[in-house]
Curated annotation (Swiss-Prot):
Taxonomic superkingdom: Bacteria
Keyword terms: Coiled coil, Isopeptide bond, Ubl conjugation pathway
Organism: Mycobacterium ulcerans (strain Agy99)
Protein name as it appears in the record: Prokaryotic ubiquitin-like protein Pup
Modification comment: Is modified by deamidation of its C-terminal glutamine to glutamate by the deamidase Dop, a prerequisite to the subsequent pupylation process.
Signal peptide span: none
Isoglutamyl lysine isopeptide (Gln-Lys) (interchain with K-? in acceptor proteins) cross-link site: Q64
Segments of this protein annotated with the region ARC ATPase binding: 21-58
Length: 64
């Protein structure tokens, strides 16, 4: 009875792809952080100019 053995890869041979993916993920995270900071800065500017109108725009009229 002959038995055949097959060797399965454990997925450890593609370190270069993992590094590329990690770098891309870090770049995306930095971009999202910058976009979030820009949005928060824009909101701060609006609030500094006219906070009353900003709040009034988001408060429902008539207590509803």
């Amino acid at each position: 009875m002959a038995q055949e053995q097959t060797k399965r890869g454990g997925g450890g041979g593609d370190d270069e792809d993992v590094t590329g993916t990690t770098a891309a993920g870090q770049e995306r995270r930095k971009k999202l952080a910058q976009d979030t900071d820009d949005l928060l800065d824009e909101i701060d500017d609006v609030l500094e100019e006219n906070a009353e109108d900003f709040v009034r725009a988001y408060v429902q009229k008539g207590g509803q």
